[in-house]
Each structure stands twice: as structure tokens, then as C-alpha cells.
Amino acid sequence: MDEKQLYKHIITKSTNTCVKFTPRDITKITDYVYLGNYRNVIELPNKTFFKYIVNVSMLKYKLKRTDITVLHFPLEDNDTVSISKHIDAVTYVLKKCESLKIPVLVHCMAGINRSSAMIMGYLMEIRDKNIPFVIYFLYIYHELKYIRGAFIENKSFLNQIIDKYI
């Protein structure tokens, strides 16, 4: 077993945990990047600080309000879809928003698989390279799973992220 296979095995075994509850609230990921679900978008108050919403669900919608721009990256939640190009595109947007200090909310329908995978990809991309990948990955995964109750339950998405960044 080589190092990459060993890391993948450790991460796969360490992330095989049960869902404790489904996420309801928006979670602050960084100073300007947030993770949520479709319901969070529908229930946004009239005064919100989000300037961009990244929608990675299949549902295309327009907000009645004009103070928020919705960017749609349609992504199915199944075991056969490739998420790599979506991670790259969403990471580009999130890096740009972060650098310009523009608040952005990333969501899918439930805020569990698609949007969580995009967030994990973003965090892997911007991580401190002095911290070993496997340690950082497990830290982020378990922290967000603890906060949100469910986080990247689609094992195909999880494996694709591992393969992309190991």
C-alpha cells in the first residue's frame, strides 16, 4: 500500500460516521464564506450582508431582490457525477469573494453533499500546506460534521475530493 492509498484508507474509515441531525442554520466557514441550504436562502431577511449566493443545486431560481447576485452551478447529488470542475469553478469564486471581502453563501438543497463538497474543496485549496493533508482534512470534516450534523454524506463526493487533493 502506497502513501496515497494509506491516506485514503484512513480518511475513508474515519469519515464513516452516522448523521446526527440535518443542518438548519447557516454556518460561517471563513470571514466571508458561509455554508447553508435552500431554505436559508428563501428565508434570508430583508437586510442581509450576502452579496453573492452560489447555488450548486439543480433548482434554478431568481431572487426578487436585486442586492444579491445568484451564481448557478447545477450539480446533481448522485454517485456518478464528477464534481472536480465544479470545485475548481466555485473555489475561484470563493477566493475572489474572500480577497475582495465580499460575503458569499454557498448552498444546495439540504446543505449536506453538494455545497459541503464545494466548501471542503475550497478549504483544501486554501489550506496551509505545512499542515499534512490528512490531518487538515479530518479536522475540517469532523468540525463541520459536529456543527452541522451531516456533512458530505455522499461517499463518491468524498472520494473525489480525497483523490483531487492527496
Curated annotation (Swiss-Prot):
Induction, per UniProt: Expressed in the late phase of the viral replicative cycle.
Record family assignment: Belongs to the protein-tyrosine phosphatase family. Non-receptor class dual specificity subfamily.
Role: Serine/Tyrosine phosphatase which down-regulates cellular antiviral response by dephosphorylating activated STAT1 and blocking interferon (IFN)-stimulated innate immune responses.
Enzyme Commission (EC) number: 3.1.3.-, 3.1.3.48
Protein name stated in the entry: Probable dual specificity protein phosphatase H1 homolog
Known partners and oligomeric status: Homodimer.
CDD domains: DSP
Reactions catalysed according to its record: O-phospho-L-tyrosyl-[protein] + H2O = L-tyrosyl-[protein] + phosphate; O-phospho-L-seryl-[protein] + H2O = L-seryl-[protein] + phosphate
Catalytic site: C108 (phosphocysteine intermediate)
Chief location: virion
Cellular component per GO, a single term: host cell cytoplasm
Domain called Tyrosine-protein phosphatase: residue spans: 25-166
One GO term of the biological process aspect: symbiont-mediated suppression of host type I interferon-mediated signaling pathway
Subcellular localization, as worded in the UniProt entry: Virion; Host cytoplasm
Species, as recorded: Fowlpox virus (strain NVSL)
Keywords: Host cytoplasm, Host-virus interaction, Hydrolase, Inhibition of host innate immune response by virus, Inhibition of host interferon signaling pathway by virus, Inhibition of host STAT1 by virus, Interferon antiviral system evasion, Late protein, Protein phosphatase, Viral immunoevasion, Virion
EC supergroup of this enzyme: hydrolase
